[in-house]
A protein has these predicted regions:
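Conserved active-site neighborhood of enzyme catalytic/cofactor-binding cores
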Residues: 559
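C-terminal accessory regions
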Residues: 381, 563-585
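Nucleic acid-machinery interaction/catalytic patches
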Residues: 1-554
Length: 585
């Protein structure tokens, strides 16, 4: 038996509950996510996101004969991959989707394009101006006419390397007529929206009598046309619930199991009608509400509570402030949100190093600009590169040299200073310089790791260092293989972008202590006490990003994801999260 969850978090809690019920050691069932189920049954691997854009750029140039640089292509290349992914996950016919735009009446009015989309398209059309909508329409149609060719070439290019984007991998699995599933039974628990490709997989397993389904919902949003129940109502039509709320069997099983409260399956799905203590609080700023965590935990006597309290962050950027606001009495905390790498000193260090070797180092010279040198040496982690950093600062300030040379900066032939002020621009071409910059950043991180090896640095420092190294090394591999060919400005922008989107996972006992989690981590989990921060419009549900080359009417016609889908999903997350909660703030 394999239990399939929407995410991994629920499996950790289920293990704990099974142990409590049995009171002795038992064999734990196997757990996987639905994404892992697809990946286990495909010979393809999901490619690195940057690798995907690089290969898409090659397909674009081949199919359109527009020799556009990768840095100009990068932004809308990501958008196009998202559209391709959506087409495949919803099992739409790409040929029909891309050909129909030429015929729909929206093209008489291109207002559905956002300003950002227009700017992206304009990069390809140097003679286009905002006043010439007809010209934009003409050029945009020309671009659209190549999208099917790009889609086919891109998928073929990736498949030849044994790679795919996620939607293409999913589609490959469900269209494989020879697919054999490894396990005898798959138990799907707690899903809401199933994309068409996922529904086809579930349907196939059910027809082979290998799948059962457990749905989590409440009667309050199953009647009428409540948006929170939209997908559950649909799922129940195709995939019957093992806990049938209306069956005599479920009530009989509840009695046989000695359920003293008479909690039948019918009762399990009727929780929102019960009384709850709900408090609303307003705060003038995001930071003020984050600091309210301290007050809420203390006033409710929850500091030492284990496992039954959750703080949900609709805006996950509040995590650092929330962590600093926890009362000292709190003994155990489990954090399911990754700590943003951008919030660590390593992000600012990488920024400073890029500036030092860029605007801080005049090309073809042996000197550095004093401003960038001092800013780098004063960074809190500079002492981990060289313990002479403060001595160099004193020397520079006493001499008042605005362009110190390398020999002055590398005091006492110090190894760390020699790495820090290494010349990386004595190369013959752009690719060599980019490799030199990435190797330079990696060597700095290695130096920090070596110098802190014997020191008692905290775990966050160690994890931040490791993640920083991983990000840079990932880019180095793409440049080295020839997949990533960009100018240095674009490379620097990519480095910082990756740091901004990378999180550091926390490790701890998952079912112990106060839970601090994002919205998605609440799926399948129930808590008696919940504090939801940033429960505002624009935060939950989040402002919808509809950046796409496919207009709403076509998306709707071919069953692609629209704003309607996203609103229904957000509504379900909210109502499901609170349905069994007793104290909500």
């Amino acid at each position: 038996i394999v239990v399939v969850f929407p995410n991994k978090r629920a499996s950790l809690f289920l293990d704990t509950y099974l142990a409590e019920i049995e009171h002795e050691a038992i064999w734990s069932p196997s757990y996987i996510t639905i994404s892992e189920l697809f990946r286990q049954n495909s010979p393809l691997k999901v490619a690195d996101p940057i690798k995907l854009v690089c290969d898409l750029h090659k397909s674009f140039v081949k199919c359109t004969e527009i020799d556009e640089t990768l840095d100009h292509f990068y932004g809308w290349g990501q958008m196009l991959i998202t559209d391709f992914d959506d087409i495949d996950k919803n099992m739409a016919d790409a040929q029909l989707v891309f050909s129909n735009l030429k015929d729909i009446h929206e093209l008489d009015d291109i207002s559905y394009l956002t300003d950002d989309q227009k700017k992206m398209i304009q990069r390809f059309f140097s003679n286009f101006s905002e006043d010439h909508n007809s010209e934009l329409k003409k050029r945009f149609l020309q671009l659209w006419s190549h999208f099917l060719d790009i889609y086919n070439d891109f998928n073929s290019r990736l498949a030849q390397q044994g790679l795919a984007y996620e939607g293409a991998l999913y589609r490959q699995v469900v269209t494989d007529e020879n697919l054999k599933f490894e396990h005898k039974k798959y138990v799907f628990v707690g899903f809401n929206m199933l994309q068409k490709v996922e529904m086809q997989l579930c349907d196939r397993l059910m027809k082979e009598e290998k799948a059962v389904f457990y749905w989590d919902y409440d009667k309050a949003y199953m009647d009428n046309n409540h948006e929170a129940g939209h997908y559950i109502r649909q799922n129940l039509k195709y995939f019957p619930n093992e806990l049938d709320a209306d069956s005599d069997k479920s009530k009989l099983e509840a009695n046989e199991n000695g359920n003293e409260s008479g909690q039948s399956a019918e009762n399990i799905y009727d929780n929102l009608s019960r009384k709850k203590r709900i408090n609303y609080f307003s705060a003038p700023t995001e930071n003020v509400q984050a600091r309210f965590v301290h007050t809420w935990l203390k006033e409710n006597g929850l500091c030492k509570e284990t496992g039954n309290v959750a703080i949900v962050l609709a805006d996950e950027s509040l995590l650092p402030t929330v962590l600093h606001s926890l009362p000292k009495e709190v003994e155990h905390v489990n954090i399911t949100i990754g700590y943003p790498l951008q919030q660590t000193p390593f992000y600012s260090l990488i920024q400073q190093l890029i500036q030092l070797q860029g605007i801080g180092h005049p090309k073809a010279s042996n000197t550095y600009r004093l401003h960038q040198v001092l800013a780098t040496l004063r960074h809190p982690y500079a002492r981990y590169i060289s313990q002479l950093n403060l001595q160099v600062i004193e020397q520079l300030e006493s001499k008042k040299t605005f362009y110190p040379d390398r020999s002055t900066l590398i005091m006492n032939e110090d190894e760390g200073l020699a790495i820090l002020f290494r010349d990386i621009d004595k190369v013959e071409n752009l690719d060599e310089y980019n490799m030199g910059l990435l190797n330079y950043l990696i060597d700095i991180l290695k130096q920090i790791g070596y110098n802190t090896k014997q020191q008692n640095v905290d775990q966050l420092f160690q994890e931040s260092l490791f993640r920083s190294y991983t990000v840079i090394n990932r880019l180095r591999g793409l440049v080295e293989s020839g997949d990533l060919k960009v100018d240095t400005i674009t490379l620097e922008r990519l480095i910082l972008q990756l740091f901004q989107t990378t999180s550091i996972p926390f490790h701890g006992e998952p079912a112990v202590g106060i839970q601090i989690m994002g919205v998605l981590e609440t799926r399948n989990l129930d808590f008696d006490y919940m504090l939801v921060l940033s429960c505002n419009e624009g935060k939950w549900p989040k402002g919808v990003n509809d950046a796409s080359f496919i207009p709403y009417s076509i998306r709707k016609a071919y069953g692609l994801t629209t704003i309607d889908n996203k609103v229904a999903i957000s509504a379900y997350y909210f109502y499901r999260m609170i349905q069994r909660c007793q104290h909500l703030a």
